[in-house]
Amino acid sequence: MIRRPPRSTPKPSSAASDVYKRQTPYDQRGSSFSDASLRPLSPILSELRLIKNEDEINYLKKACEITVEGHKVAMQYAQKNMFEYQIEAEMEKTFYDLGAERLGYPSIVASGDNACILHYSTNREKVDNSGLVLIDAGAEYNMYSSDVTRTFPINGKFSAPQKDVYQEVLKAQTLGINSVNTKNTMSDIHKLAVSSISQSLVDLGLVPMGVDETISMMHYFEFFMHGTGHWLGLDVHDAGSVEENNKPRKLMPGMVTTVEPGIYILSLIHI
């Protein structure tokens, strides 16, 4: 057997050695930038994400289509004495069956008073046999998220007071959707929704004062405690400022926003 001599480590050429010796140690390289002006890229990237192109709009539409089907399945599947997580599982299975890659955010399946807890995601309670179920869930398609919230009666039929409240929320949402145009800002849409919800609270007898005071004293906030909408895109609450030059920015073609007012009433009020 012939043994080969062990390979020796090649010696660097004198030129390479000189270059190596002249290299600045890593921990000293930043010193030459001490006078540089550094600015974050996030404002620029946020602006790029704010206006969606045609492909992005199509991805969002597909995500919404998948989400709508999942919500429909959940409504049909839900029965009394089920647990919230059972409804959640059936809905999310539908998302994935239809091509969703992941969830846009943790699904909310909230029955009874759980629906009054913003961002409730425990989903462990048994559904009240005569109550309502709120589902706030969205599938993600090609990295773009949807966001859909719906409320329905577990027994398949709204009571008269429940129907009245539902119609008032729908009225506010329709007003908001119809106001999504280049004449308005996100703030304008929220003010319209607040005005509509406040009038509804007065009409339903949920506040003991008139509309103007309900708004000025923010009495509506007990029943509608969040914004009306937010940008939608790669994130469910997508990047991009609602202001431009310290003023509310007008909506532009390519922007995508949700419109989701609500009236949240605890069971002790007997609605």
Task: Annotate each PLM feature.
Residues 1-20, 269-270:
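Single conserved hydrophobic/aromatic residue that forms the stacking wall/gate
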Residues 17-269:
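Active-site neighborhoods and metal-handling regions in enzymes and metal-associated proteins
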